[in-house]
Swiss-Prot record:
<protein>
    <recommendedName>
        <fullName>Enolase</fullName>
        <ecNumber>4.2.1.11</ecNumber>
    </recommendedName>
</protein>
<dbReference type="GO" id="GO:0006096">
    <property type="term" value="P:glycolytic process"/>
</dbReference>
<feature type="binding site">
    <location>
        <position position="371"/>
    </location>
    <ligand>
        <name>(2R)-2-phosphoglycerate</name>
    </ligand>
</feature>
<dbReference type="InterPro" id="IPR000941">
    <property type="entry name" value="Enolase"/>
</dbReference>
<keyword id="KW-0456">Lyase</keyword>
<dbReference type="InterPro" id="IPR036849">
    <property type="entry name" value="Enolase-like_C_sf"/>
</dbReference>
<dbReference type="InterPro" id="IPR020811">
    <property type="entry name" value="Enolase_N"/>
</dbReference>
<dbReference type="GO" id="GO:0004634">
    <property type="term" value="F:phosphopyruvate hydratase activity"/>
</dbReference>
<dbReference type="InterPro" id="IPR020809">
    <property type="entry name" value="Enolase_CS"/>
</dbReference>
<keyword id="KW-0964">Secreted</keyword>
<dbReference type="GO" id="GO:0009986">
    <property type="term" value="C:cell surface"/>
</dbReference>
<feature type="binding site">
    <location>
        <position position="316"/>
    </location>
    <ligand>
        <name>Mg(2+)</name>
    </ligand>
</feature>
<feature type="binding site">
    <location>
        <position position="164"/>
    </location>
    <ligand>
        <name>(2R)-2-phosphoglycerate</name>
    </ligand>
</feature>
<feature type="active site" description="Proton acceptor">
    <location>
        <position position="341"/>
    </location>
</feature>
<comment type="function">
    <text>Catalyzes the reversible conversion of 2-phosphoglycerate (2-PG) into phosphoenolpyruvate (PEP). It is essential for the degradation of carbohydrates via glycolysis.</text>
</comment>
<comment type="similarity">
    <text>Belongs to the enolase family.</text>
</comment>
<keyword id="KW-0479">Metal-binding</keyword>
Amino acid sequence: MGFHIYEIKARQIIDSRGNPTVEADVILEDGTCGRSAVPSGASTGINEAVELRDGDKSVYMGKGVLKAIENIKNIIAPELEGMSALNQVAIDRKMLELDGTPTKEKLGANAILAVSMATAKAAAKYLGLKVYQYLGAYKANILPTPMCNIINGGAHSDNSVDFQEFMIMPVGAKTFSEAIRMAVEVFHTLKGILNGKGYATSVGDEGGFAPNLKSNEEACEMIIEAIKKAGYEPGKDIAIALDPATSELYDPKTKKYVLKWSTKEELTSEQMVEYWSKWVEKYPIISIEDGMAEEDWDGWKKLTDKIGHKIQLVGDDLFVTNTSFLKKGIEMGVANSILIKVNQIGTLTETFEAVEMAKKAGYTAIVSHRSGETEDTTIADLVVALGTGQIKTGSLSRTDRIAKYNQLIRIEEELETTAEYHGKNVFYSIKQKQIKSL
């Protein structure tokens, strides 16, 4: 028949931060090969699936992944060889059974995910389909509104900005290609503004600029200036999205948020909610990810009650792409969106289950990269297959980020007249869809 798995290979390669990661090849009986490499995060949720590292400080500073690779070769491969690559659910469930732990700590989520994604790519190639067509079938025609990271702070840079990501979303574009053009123009305009003010234009892990700004507010003000100077209207054409990654700022002992890179100010949950409420009134912000810490469920509830009808509130560390945590959030009325990171959960099957649960509850879903990426473009196909309408995959620089955007441009071209770009209409979880304009 040809579609059964004949062999699985695995190797240690290097990601965009110079750290080792896992790449797997799934080879079918007829010689068809699917290859995939897994990403890695810098700021990680405490409930994420475990990324297995070797821990030998004398090799790659302890970040080697040879244990994960051995698990693929010695445990996963013997069980999967002979199985049908066309049954993704069976493949993923077999690996979950082999691991047997809630966080995949035995085999490593990096081992499991590499094989899961490579299997899907092999199956698609065997059937003569693109990955997005194979995974999404007839529904795979929505191109995502991108969240483009243009200023980095926090754990993704070495500057005085507390919040990790300041992003732009071209909500007024008519096509994905136009959205990328708009974002690129703002990116280059911002570079000119930073140069003019004497700020460095070096970039962080995700390709955004990492200037040593005077305050967190200055980042928003610079972005608004760049949007206007590029010829667009803030809010109407291009909105701002934030990922403050506040779990990195939260002290669970004092239950306070410490703005440790800027003012050293300590804020209670209530004060943090008010902080974001004022920002939403002041700036054209449409989305805030991890506006409260993952342990601070009460704070999350207060934030959702306060501004959840106005903007998209995205749970990343809060939900870690896990249906158990998402279910809790839905029942509590916490957040209105989930960030989807395949390596947080570890298999494509579980990823699809999380998106399905979110959609049924009226939550939006955003497919996301990690700060440590590779040239693998699977998430570009995945976002179209899932039809979530939003992607977060870094800035308009660094090949590891651009590769995903370029793949989406190709997909849009392939879809021709059936391609859809929903722009600001992707925010179906918000009751009040009016984005503040300036």
